[in-house]
């Protein structure tokens, strides 16, 4: 956890920041004489006040610089950012969701019941489920964790959940070993971002592809895909938003990192007009792909190219139902209620589920509460039945 500093240093910190604020406030008063409004601006309806506010916001240094100064002092003295980020070593940043203790153990149980309920519903519809639990960035890079350590809850969270899923008959490949091996070839997670790198996404796609082929979970004619690697570009990680240091103190920020964009496309057609590696009817009687993907921004954001890497690893086209900013549960429940999914379900569904969401609460208020409760109840019922059989 974060170490405390001595009381004299705390007083010095407060005094220094207070002095800076007073100095900037005095400086800002120089901008008042420069204010002018249109001659016909009414005084009593608030327009003059709004005009002055806009002028002051533009000229007031505290408005523009105070956030930078506070963030710089927090970062340099306390090695902290805004709530949401944990500062690691060597310029690494982590989401605090991988460090927080769970509010209660019940949330993990509720989420597990939903996962089981989803599995039961997919089985009823004839859809095979592959649960891809993505190991936490902090689990893969403990060497870059700083003073703050993950709560004890996270110690065995990944392996315990994986064992639980497998015991329930859910296909859940172990992705941790593959990602650890891939670290020798480059970063599998981005230093300043919550997300994986294209290499990490490709590694997981290849591991899932091997598992699915070995277990014969997908039975479709092969379709070849090719991946093209683009130029490297500077990537600003999403965790940097919790360190509002630029433009004044951008030199304090972790060094910029490069992201090499990858794009995957179907292989070009052969001279006879047939796609390389494809059969006469790519998807049997239907043109709808028999493979689907659902999950979070790990799957939805094209920067990581997980969708493309999975297509190439499985030699099969897919429909991507993943969404950004909603976690793994909400897109899955939306999918279960999707009319097209109901009428023409895929043969196989890959559910990408980052480890950090396992004990987290999700906003499921858009769904009918009774329906969600029924899903949980069906999952819990299967769990109790399995436990009674083992007794």
Swiss-Prot record:
Any Pfam family hit: ALGX
Keyword terms of this UniProt record: Acyltransferase, Alginate biosynthesis, Cell inner membrane, Cell membrane, Membrane, Periplasm, Signal, Transferase
Enzyme Commission number(s): 2.3.1.-
Catalytic-site annotation from UniProt: 193, 195, 297
Membrane topology: Peripheral membrane protein
MF terms (GO), sorted A to Z: acyltransferase activity
GO terms under cellular component: periplasmic space; plasma membrane
InterPro entries per UniProt: AlgJ (IPR034657), ALGX/ALGJ_SGNH-like (IPR031811)
CDD domains given in the database record: AlgJ_like (cd14442)
Span of the signal peptide: 1-39
Superkingdom in the source lineage: Bacteria
Cell location: Cell inner membrane; Periplasm
Gene Ontology process terms (BP): alginic acid acetylation; alginic acid biosynthetic process
Pathway assigned in UniProt: Glycan biosynthesis; alginate biosynthesis
Positions of the UniProt region annotated as Disordered: 259-286
Protein purpose: Together with AlgI and AlgF, forms an inner membrane complex which probably interacts with the alginate polymerization-transport complex and adds acetyl groups at the O-2 and O-3 positions of mannuronate residues. Acetylation of alginate is important for the architecture of biofilms and increases resistance to opsonic killing in the host.
Family assignment from sequence similarity: Belongs to the AlgJ family.
Protein name as catalogued: Probable alginate O-acetylase AlgJ
Gene of this entry: algJ
């Amino acid at each position: 956890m974060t170490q405390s500093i001595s009381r004299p240093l705390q007083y010095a910190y407060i005094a220094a920041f207070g002095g800076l604020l007073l100095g900037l406030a005095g400086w800002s008063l120089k901008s008042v004489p420069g204010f002018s409004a249109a001659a016909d601006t009414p005084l009593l309806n608030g327009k003059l006040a709004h005009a002055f506010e806009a002028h002051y916001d533009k000229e007031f240094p505290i408005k523009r610089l105070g956030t930078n100064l506070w963030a710089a002092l927090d970062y340099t003295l306390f090695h902290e950012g805004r709530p949401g980020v944990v500062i690691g070593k060597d310029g690494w940043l982590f989401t605090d969701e991988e460090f927080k203790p769970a509010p209660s153990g019940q949330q993990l149980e509720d989420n597990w019941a939903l996962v089981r309920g989803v599995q039961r519903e997919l089985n009823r519809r004839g859809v095979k489920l592959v649960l891809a639990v993505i190991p936490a960035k902090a689990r893969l890079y403990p060497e870059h964790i700083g003073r703050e350590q993950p709560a004890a809850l996270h110690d065995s969270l990944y392996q315990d959940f994986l064992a639980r899923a497998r015991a329930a008959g859910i296909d859940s490949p172990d992705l941790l070993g593959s990602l650890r091996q891939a670290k020798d070839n480059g970063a599998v997670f981005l230093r300043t971002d919550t997300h994986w790198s294209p290499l990490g996404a490709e590694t997981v796609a290849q591991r899932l592809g091997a598992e699915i082929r070995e277990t014969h979970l997908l039975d479709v004619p092969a379709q070849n895909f090719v991946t093209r690697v683009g130029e490297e570009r500077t990537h600003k990680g999403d965790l940097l938003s919790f360190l509002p240091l630029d433009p004044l103190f951008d030199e304090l920020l972790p060094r910029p990192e490069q992201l090499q964009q990858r794009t995957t496309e179907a292989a070009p057609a052969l001279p006879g007009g047939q796609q390389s590696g494809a059969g006469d009817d790519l998807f049997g009687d239907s043109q709808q792909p028999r493979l689907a993907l659902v999950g979070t921004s790990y799957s939805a954001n094209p920067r990581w190219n997980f969708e493309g890497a999975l297509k190439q690893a499985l030699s099969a086209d897919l429909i991507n139902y993943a969404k950004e900013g909603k976690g793994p549960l909400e897109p899955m429940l939306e999918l279960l209620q999707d009319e097209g999914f109901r009428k023409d379900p895929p043969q196989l569904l890959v559910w990408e589920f980052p480890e950090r969401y396992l004990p987290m609460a999700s906003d499921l208020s858009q769904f009918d509460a009774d329906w969600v409760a029924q899903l949980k109840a069906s999952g819990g019922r299967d769990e109790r039945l399995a436990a009674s059989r083992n007794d």
